[in-house]
């Protein structure tokens, strides 16, 4: 969960700061994966909190307790609305291979982005008065 100081952060990043504006310095566990805010919101059908909930479900499903530490916490500058996937879940997604988990998540984010673009292209323009 959300913590301050020299403690490490995993999970949803709640912030009044807009997404895509990396202004939140923090440390994350080595081997973590950060899902960008726009993709989090897309997974929640435009609702970031719903996106957090959806991601948390599969992060818990793939969490692998056999994973051992990948190294020292890594300093990052994050944005509100992003989601830090813990290395234990990245490892589980990769069937026991952290690098494979990162590759799978890279592809997943890329596909989400493409799907989001297609969805936006299909939407009618805003109504005018």
Give the predicted meaning of each segment:
Residues 1-129:
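Gly/Thr/Ser/Pro-rich low-complexity intrinsically disordered regions
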């Amino acid at each position: 969960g959300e913590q301050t100081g020299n403690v490490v952060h995993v999970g949803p990043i709640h912030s009044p700061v807009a997404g895509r504006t990396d202004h939140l310095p923090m440390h994350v566990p080595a081997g973590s994966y950060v899902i960008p805010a726009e993709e989090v919101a897309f997974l929640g059908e435009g609702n970031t909190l719903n996106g957090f909930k959806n991601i948390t479900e599969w992060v818990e499903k793939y969490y692998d307790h056999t994973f051992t530490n990948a190294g020292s916490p890594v300093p990052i500058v994050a944005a509100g609305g992003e989601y830090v996937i813990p290395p234990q879940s990245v490892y589980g997604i990769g069937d026991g291979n952290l690098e494979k988990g990162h590759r799978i998540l890279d592809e997943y984010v890329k596909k989400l982005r493409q799907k989001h673009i297609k969805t936006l292209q299909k939407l009618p323009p805003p109504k005018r008065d």
